[in-house]
Regions:
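Short, Lys/Arg-enriched N-terminal segments with co-localized hydrophobic residues
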Residues: 14, 18-42
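N-terminal small-domain helix-loop-helix segment of the aminotransferase-like
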Residues: 45-140, 147
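Helix C-cap/helix->beta junction micro-motif
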Residues: 70, 176, 236-237
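Short acidic capping loops at alpha-helix termini that bridge into adjacent secondary structure
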Residues: 129-135, 155-158, 205
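Conserved PLP-anchoring active-site segment centered on the Schiff-base-forming lysine
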Residues: 151-173
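A short helix-loop-beta submotif of the ANL/AMP-binding
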Residues: 175-181
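Active-site phosphate-binding strand-loop segment of PLP-dependent enzymes
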Residues: 186-243
Length: 243
């Protein structure tokens, strides 16, 4: 009975964890018994999960929806979504795949035809050679990034993250047990990659750096010279570039 009770408590109140993290003061004031639920949930979660903060972008999504429901015209900058629908050729291909019963398990690392197409793209557009066994397919960007961080980083490691950054980077690193080390890209420099700041942040504990270009959210495009210098630093100090 104790196990069932804990499961019921978890499933009934886990949604409160998110809301408490976003606006806990309001909830504590409005419902006197919320604290009990929150404490029960905390006891069930590991320390690494307790360390993770909900994405601010998703919290704003709820706020935007609420304002729009009130008839307020809102421009949302929190999510990187295009202002147009999925192109028809993509919709048609997805439907055709379903109709062809392509709905079963694939090879864990991804469909071979897709991996071969990616290798061809890299050779044509980037002049680099990859083999299909060096390619893994993920569901979107977040899953393979989390996989990479969890595979490479652990407690005692440091991961450099140039900021402003995608909010999920910091939480991914914390989830692995490693420590995020933030290096500010300056607005007065057009948010260019702060290579000098990265140099100062490197320590014997540095395991990786997480970057993307164009940067999310600033849109800054790092130059070939900056990226070459970063690659040289990675080789010199033996850390990974996760991008």
């Amino acid at each position: 009975m104790n196990i069932i009770s804990k499961k019921e408590t978890f499933y009934n109140y886990i949604h409160l964890w998110y809301h408490l993290s976003i606006n806990k003061n309001e909830l504590f004031e409005s419902q006197g018994n919320i604290k009990t639920y929150r404490e029960e949930i905390i006891m069930m979660l590991t320390k690494r999960i307790q360390n993770i903060k909900p994405a601010a972008t998703l919290a704003l999504t709820g706020k935007v929806a609420e304002l729009r429901k009130q008839g307020i015209d809102v421009i949302a900058f929190n999510l990187g979504e295009p202002d147009f629908g999925t192109p028809q050729n993509i919709c048609d291909a997805a439907k055709a795949a379903i109709d062809a019963q392509k709905t079963k398990y694939t090879v864990v690392s991804g469909i071979m035809d897709l991996k071969e197409a990616i290798c061809a793209k890299f050779l044509k557009d980037n002049n680099v050679v990859y083999k299909p066994n060096e390619i893994c397919i993920g569901t979107g960007a977040k899953q393979p990034l989390v996989n990479a961080v969890l595979a490479l980083c652990e407690e005692g490691d440091e991961v450099i993250i140039p900021t402003p950054c995608w909010v999920s980077y910091i939480e991914m690193v914390k989830l692995s047990g490693a420590t995020p080390v933030l290096v500010q890209n300056r607005e007065e420099d057009g948010f260019a990659l702060n290579v000098e700041g990265i140099k100062k942040a490197i320590t014997p504990k540095t395991k990786a750096i997480m970057i993307n270009t164009p940067n999310n959210p600033t849109g800054a495009v790092y130059t070939k010279e900056q990226l070459t210098e970063l690659a040289e630093l990675a080789c010199k100090h033996d850390f990974y570039i996760i991008s």
